[in-house]
From Swiss-Prot:
InterPro entries: Trm112-like. Pfam families: Trm112p. Belongs to the UPF0434 family. HAMAP family: UPF0434. GO terms for cellular component: cytosol. It comes from Alcanivorax borkumensis (strain ATCC 700651 / DSM 11573 / NCIMB 13689 / SK2). PANTHER family: PROTEIN PREY, MITOCHONDRIAL (PTHR33505:SF4), ZGC:162634 (PTHR33505). This is UPF0434 protein ABO_2103.
Length: 62
């Protein structure tokens, strides 16, 4: 689980848009950039090179 206060202040480093936490995949997802950032051991890895590109369908479903 990610601290809700932390989630309130984190934004996508690429688009500066808000992030949505997906508990199933342990990722922070950004609809605007289409990137999903991993959360490892409760720590968000907010590096573009570590992000996974989501499919258009996945990004639109957010």
């Amino acid at each position: 689980m990610l601290d809700p206060n932390l989630l309130d202040i984190l934004v996508c480093p690429v688009s500066k848009a808000p992030l949505i936490y997906d508990e199933k995949t342990a990722e922070l997802k950004c609809k605007a950039s289409g990137l999903a950032y991993p959360v490892r051991d409760g720590i968000p890895v907010m590096l573009e090179e570590q992000a996974r590109a989501m499919s258009d369908e996945e990004a639109l479903s957010l």
